[in-house]
């Protein structure tokens, strides 16, 4: 798992973001949904920057129409609590 922390400093405010690799388990309710239909951005406030396929192939900046499959790993960027919440849904 990527445990990179990115600190973005804006006027008097510091925002700590986490980038992590989240595995899609066999029972995840996200399987078969497109990224758009999964509403990850709206429900979790996260950005999916890439998808790592079982084969190891990386899809950077996946399209909204990308369909999530079992075995995929979503590379998510956002606040730690939000990443943790999505991780639970990914596992199913």
Q: At which residue positions do the language-model features occur?
A:
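Cytosolic Rossmann-like ligand/nucleotide-binding regulatory domains
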Residues: 21, 25-92
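Anionic-ligand-binding alpha/beta catalytic cores of soluble enzymes and soluble regulatory domains
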Residues: 1-19, 23
């Amino acid at each position: 798992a990527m445990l990179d922390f990115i600190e973005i400093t804006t006027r008097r405010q510091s925002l700590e973001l986490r980038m992590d690799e989240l595995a899609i388990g066999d029972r995840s309710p996200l399987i078969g949904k497109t990224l758009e239909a999964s509403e990850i951005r709206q429900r979790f406030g996260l950005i999916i920057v890439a998808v790592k396929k079982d084969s190891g192939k990386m899809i950077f900046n996946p399209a909204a129409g990308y369909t999530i499959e079992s075995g995929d790993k979503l590379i998510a960027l956002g606040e730690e609590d939000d990443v943790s919440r999505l991780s639970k849904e990914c596992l199913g």
